[in-house]
Amino acid sequence: MFLKTVMERNQPLVRLGIEWQQNGVILPDTYLLDYDTILENARSIKQAGDANGVQNFFMLKQIGRNPLIARALTDMGYVGAVCVDFREALTMVENQIPLGNVGHLVQIPRAALKKILRAKPVIVTVYTLEKAREISAACTELGLHQKLMLRVLGEGDMLYSGQYGGFELQELDSAVRAIEAMPNVEVGGVCSFPCFLYDEAAQDILPMPNLRTVQTAAEMLRASPLARSSLALTTFRKTSGRTCASTR
């Protein structure tokens, strides 16, 4: 889907790929990554985030969860990796890459839970109280404390097929009450996906109803007497499109 943009902006990479494939240097179905350009784009994004008080995480599922690039990004000052599925999280753990957020699209399976929690992710997304209880039990056994981010749902939210799940706004209060009673975990934020999508007609990235759901949930939690006084609430407003106009 990005081939046209690559051909327009990075012709040397395209020419090199053709040359290497035709000369037998690489096989078909080989991924070529322009390391220098990736890092240049990453610096631009981080500078924009820093200037606006936004913590920067990175996601590498689109480029094969590459640990070499992940290490360069953490050295650059990125907080850690966003691992939307457990295989990506395990790859990062095995390469000593800090974990930012885990479980956003695919919940962490029980069999991988302890290994991932030992890596001390900044925050773990949960869709259900059952998963929160599993994390609580594992953290209690391991002697860890984990922040949880609740995926929230509102009426009219845009959801992709196969990605349903989360806490409806009307049950958020009771869910927070239940989680705050669990040992070794706490509510640390709310999220949804996608909160922004590219609109072909408008030729721009526009907010989805999910964004208002996240804002409402955050307001509810901040106003709730159930939330711990030390809670520094994090809202993740996930986009499904590129949002930094200055990248190459």
Per-range role (PLM):
Residues 101-102, 108-154:
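A generic, well-ordered mixed alpha/beta core segment in the N-terminal half of proteins
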Residues 31, 56-60, 79-83, 98-104, ...:
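Hydrophobic faces of well-ordered beta-strands that scaffold small-molecule active sites
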Residues 41, 45, 69, 88, ...:
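A general structural detector for well-ordered alpha-helical segments in enzyme core domains, enriched
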Residues 45-53, 73-75, 93-96, 114-119, ...:
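Acidic (Asp/Glu)-rich catalytic clusters
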Residues 1-114:
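A charged N-terminal "starter" segment
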Residues 154-248:
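Active-site loop/helix belt of alpha/beta enzymes
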